[in-house]
Amino acid sequence: MSRHYEVVFLVHPDQSEQVPAMIERYKSLIEGGNGTIHRLEDWGRRQLAYPIQNLVKAHYVLLNIEVDQAVLSELVESFRFNDAVLRHLVIKRDGPDTEQSLIMKSKDEKGDKPERSERRRRDDEEVDAAPAATDTDGDNAEAA
């Protein structure tokens, strides 16, 4: 009997380039066991709430899946024996979640803004471009 689950796993930040291959491996495991993936989100590198193995960032991946217990056990086992996976969490859900998560929605909204370094550079240029204030009435402002 298939049940719905939400799975989040954190990958070591040095292994971020391996994440697409890991996702493909887990997808084939789920779909090979007649499971369904309702939502798959790669959140990228994010700040951790507390250090894990002296790391402050990790690569987050979210899956909403519908699988039976045998496939779920195999998936959890593969998380456990993969040294790159720092943490994993499996939550049983009542039904499928297919809409975009809040984290991805906020990420999309932030995506419209320029990068922080780009904003800083632009702000610095605006300050440099502003004409210097000149004393028009002839007396010094120091006397005030």
Curated annotation (Swiss-Prot):
GO terms under cellular component: cytosolic small ribosomal subunit
GO MF annotation terms: small ribosomal subunit rRNA binding; structural constituent of ribosome
Region named Disordered: 97-144
Transport is among the record's keywords: no
Source organism superkingdom: Bacteria
InterPro entries per record: Ribosomal_bS6, Ribosomal_bS6_sf, Ribosomal_S6_plastid/chlpt, Transl_elong_EF1B/ribsomal_bS6
A matching Pfam family: Ribosomal_S6
Biased composition annotated in UniProt, kind: Basic and acidic residues: 105-124
One example of a Gene Ontology biological process annotation: translation
Entry's family note: Belongs to the bacterial ribosomal protein bS6 family.
Function according to Swiss-Prot or TrEMBL: Binds together with bS18 to 16S ribosomal RNA.
Record-given protein name: Small ribosomal subunit protein bS6
Organism: Xanthomonas campestris pv. campestris (strain B100)
Gene: rpsF
